[in-house]
């Protein structure tokens, strides 16, 4: 568990309480059902795509067999066995096994944290005493309610597809809906149990001013904390148990995005989630407070790392101290507003008319059309014509700049970064040229710096031409070495 400073005893109480709850009362039937359904779904998905497994999945299985023993029956046999065995295992047997693992002997209590003068840690005796006290706390059986209501209780009348045509280059079906949304459908047979979705709209974080810079730093982490519709994030996970489906909205530098995937059998659920994230985002102050507390604790510890200070200094040097380029810090949370973030989210996703939804995978066009008409053609639209604001993109510092940064390290080392920037036309030829340049530099640096000079374990390089702002180009080389070299 991640613990707030000064609340080690509370965290220990919570851990011991939940362990004791399992020991005394076991898991509930609904908890077990969800876990079992999820396991069966995972095996089903692996079985359906058994002819598309990557080499590393076989390699990893052979390595496990060599190091740990066991069997390699193959997914066909494994799926058949799990399908037969899992439904026959009662909750009582699972609880009996779980309770047999929780005893009063061979218990290890581990506590780690930063070595800071203002943090007081308990002694070994105090920690053991707190643990014994926590075991005596009253524990009630776990109670939960799992909603059986539909994800969307009431739907509007379906919309219509205004136009359907075939893209001559890729053979995809392109639909234009009567609310302006475009939908691209491309059937592939690479994976039988997967449909991928991506949706984009021009705009993005550059449409927000300086007062929202700190809010943007956690925007994508926060917007789905509360779940969607009538379901909290926790309840939504329960409802989606046994389904291979995921959906996540986000904002980028110059776009709003919705990404997701689903098995063909769960495609309707994917469309329902898309509809909910556009029309019924949900706030949860308690979930946000928990997120904020965790982040502040993590960031305070992170800031003790000298290499983080090095990275911060590098970012300031490259982007001329532009606040939009800076990473999030613990102090930023003093300016971050959860209600404002949700306002920003609703503002960006209030108009779906300029979104393009692309679906790729095991798609049946006739089967997907009713979902498109019901869930996408009914999304709210305002007819806004937007594009990103390149003036709000952090500009790379011009001219030559040298910064020598010193910080004490337990293991002394020197880190050297060379960064070059410029402008180059954004096209396929230049992108490929930049990629090949990076690969050539990797080979040269490996031979000259690592092998011939023995100056480092390796050199990291990158070369990139951005599409937004168009043509912004940079080349970077990073090396860690002995200060004497």
Regions found by a protein language model. Name each.
Residues 1-24, 30-87, 106-113, 184-186, ...:
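M16 family metallopeptidases and their MPP-like homologs
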Residues 33-37, 44, 64-210, 343, ...:
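Proteolytic maturation boundary segments
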Residues 441-442:
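Short Ser/Thr-interspersed hydrophobic loop/turn segments at strand-loop and sheet-helix junctions
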Residues 348-350:
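Conserved alpha/beta enzyme-core scaffolds, especially Rossmann-like or related mixed alpha/beta domains
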């Amino acid at each position: 568990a991640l613990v707030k400073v000064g609340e080690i005893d509370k965290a220990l109480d919570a851990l011991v309480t939940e362990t004791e709850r399992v020991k005394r009362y076991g898991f509930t039937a609904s908890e077990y059902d969800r876990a079992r359904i999820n396991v069966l779904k995972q095996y089903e998905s692996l079985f359906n795509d058994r002819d598309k497994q990557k080499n590393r999945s076989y390699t990893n299985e052979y390595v496990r067999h060599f190091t740990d023993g066991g069997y390699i029956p193959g997914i066909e046999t494994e799926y058949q066995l799990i399908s037969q065995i899992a439904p026959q295992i009662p909750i009582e047997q699972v609880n009996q096994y779980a309770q047999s693992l929780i005893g009063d002997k061979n218990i290890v209590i581990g506590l780690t944290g930063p070595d800071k003068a203002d943090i007081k840690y308990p002694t070994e005796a105090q920690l053991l005493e707190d643990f014994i006290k926590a075991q005596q706390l009253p524990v009630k059986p776990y109670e939960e309610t799992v909603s059986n209501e539909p994800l969307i209780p009431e739907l509007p009348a379906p919309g219509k597809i205004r136009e359907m045509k075939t893209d001559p280059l890729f053979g995809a079906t392109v639909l234009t809906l009567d609310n302006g949304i475009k939908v691209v459908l491309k059937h592939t047979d690479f994976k039988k149990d997967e449909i991928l979705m991506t949706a984009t709209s021009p705009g993005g974080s550059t449409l927000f001013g300086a007062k929202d810079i700190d809010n943007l730093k956690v925007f994508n982490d926060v917007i789905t904390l509360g779940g969607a519709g009538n379901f909290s994030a926790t309840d939504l996970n329960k409802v989606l148990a046994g389904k291979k489906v995921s959906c996540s909205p986000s904002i980028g530098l110059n776009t709003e995005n919705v990404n997701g995937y689903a098995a063909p059998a769960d495609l309707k659920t994917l469309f329902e989630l898309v509809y909910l994230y556009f029309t019924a985002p949900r706030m949860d102050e308690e979930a946000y407070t928990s997120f904020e507390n965790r982040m502040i604790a993590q960031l305070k510890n992170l800031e003790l790392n000298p290499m983080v200070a090095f990275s911060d200094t590098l970012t300031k040097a490259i982007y001329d101290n532009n606040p939009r380029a800076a990473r999030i810090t613990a102090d930023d949370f003093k300016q971050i507003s959860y209600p404002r973030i949700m306002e920003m989210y609703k503002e960006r996703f209030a108009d779906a008319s300029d979104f393009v939804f692309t679906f790729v995978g095991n798609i049946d066009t006739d089967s997907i059309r009713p979902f498109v008409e019901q869930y996408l053609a009914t999304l709210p639209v305002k007819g806004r014509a937007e594009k990103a604001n390149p003036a709000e993109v952090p500009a790379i510092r011009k001219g030559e700049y040298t910064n020598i940064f010193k910080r004490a390290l337990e293991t002394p080392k020197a880190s050297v970064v060379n960064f070059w920037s410029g402008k180059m036309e954004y096209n396929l030829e230049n992108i490929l040229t930049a990629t090949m340049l990076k690969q050539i530099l990797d080979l040269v640096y490996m031979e000259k710096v690592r092998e011939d000079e023995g100056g480092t374990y390796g050199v990291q390089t990158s070369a990139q031409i951005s599409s937004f702002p168009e043509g912004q180009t940079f080349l970077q080389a990073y090396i860690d070495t002995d200060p004497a070299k």
